[in-house]
UniProtKB/Swiss-Prot annotation:
The gene is yjgM. The keyword Metal-binding does not apply. This is Uncharacterized N-acetyltransferase YjgM. It comes from Salmonella typhimurium (strain LT2 / SGSC1412 / ATCC 700720). Pfam families: Acetyltransf_1. It is an enzyme of class 2 (transferase). It comes from the Bacteria. Gene3D superfamilies: 3.40.630.30.
């Protein structure tokens, strides 16, 4: 009988040392789905290489998923810019193919929503694209509802799917 070591998965808060690795994950997954910078997706965000600094702000948090010491995914939550103070945004949920289908996106989203509640947010907004069918299905299962108009000023002009959840 062969012994197969199962990969060690860890979900933890982002550190400054994770900036380059999570930016690579986001760029790789974005390229996989054709989510290019010219269309206003996350890869166009000027702070993509500084996520630790972004999510060190009040009310914000970001988690990375490590497999055997390598960053393979992440996601977070932050106050929604240009919006009511009780609305946060679920942001930058990206996972490499090697860890998809294991429930990590759900686990991370639930952690983010719990954090948002603890920070006093009453609603959580998100934007995504119809290309990400699995993500939309997850958000619907988590209680997010589709809304017609964007909230805040995210700059993600081609994210045509907008959702909101009461916390």
């Amino acid at each position: 009988m062969n012994n197969v070591a199962s990969p060690t998965l860890t979900v933890r808060r982002i550190t400054t040392a994770d900036n380059a690795a999570i930016a690579r994950v986001i760029r790789q997954v974005s390229a996989e789905y054709g989510l290019t910078a010219d269309k206003g997706y996350t890869v166009a965000d000027p702070n993509l290489d500084e996520l630790y600094q972004v999510y060190s702000q009040p009310g914000a948090a970001y988690w990375v998923v490590e497999q055997n010491g390598c960053v393979v995914g992440g996601g977070g939550v932050a106050p929604l810019s240009c919006s009511e103070p009780d609305i946060c945004e679920l942001q930058k949920m990206y996972f490499l193919p090697v860890i998809r289908g294991q429930g990590l996106a759900k686990k991370l989203a639930l952690m983010a929503l719990d954090h948002a509640r603890e920070q006093g947010f009453k609603r959580c907004y998100l934007e995504t694209t119809a290309f990400l069918r699995e993500a939309i299905a997850l958000y619907e299962r988590l209680g997010f509802e589709h809304i017609s108009e964007p909230l805040g000023c995210t700059g993600h002009v081609d994210c045509e799917v907008r959702m909101l959840k009461d916390l």
